[in-house]
Amino acid sequence: PLINSSVVDEQIKYHQNINIGMAVALENDSLIVPVIHRAEERNFLGLLRNASELAVRARSGKLSPEDIQGSTFTLTNPGVFGSSFGMAIINQPNVAILSTGAISKKPIVKETDFGDAIFIRSTMNLTLGYDHRIINGAYGSRFLVSVKKYLENFNSENKI
């Protein structure tokens, strides 16, 4: 729950709903952060549809004020520009932001019944920026591991 909180008047505010802000780059090198409200009620494909629709509206200047308010956690994707890593600044009052790098194929060593084997796998670097007043390194690392496991065991019907 700490990841989905905010700091208001120096107090931690816990949020029941997950409202994901997603950074969208605009043609003039500016940025806008539309929000997928109540993301916990959608499966991954529903999130993708909603994110795509919001990005199109953002780039065409057709977002409403409600579309850019109320985020509780933010995603940014410098990987879309080819970057392997990105260190994003927290979108306050959120206490965390997840940055996704470009997907690339890499050799990965896996243990098998026959010993170690090398496989080619798609990989992506994740970077979590967080407010150290609320989240420490151990908590942030556990969150990243849970995201990693979710992605490695991906099922498009699962809710977030």
Residue ranges and their predicted role:
Residues 1-160:
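C-terminal catalytic/motor cores of large multi-domain enzyme assemblies
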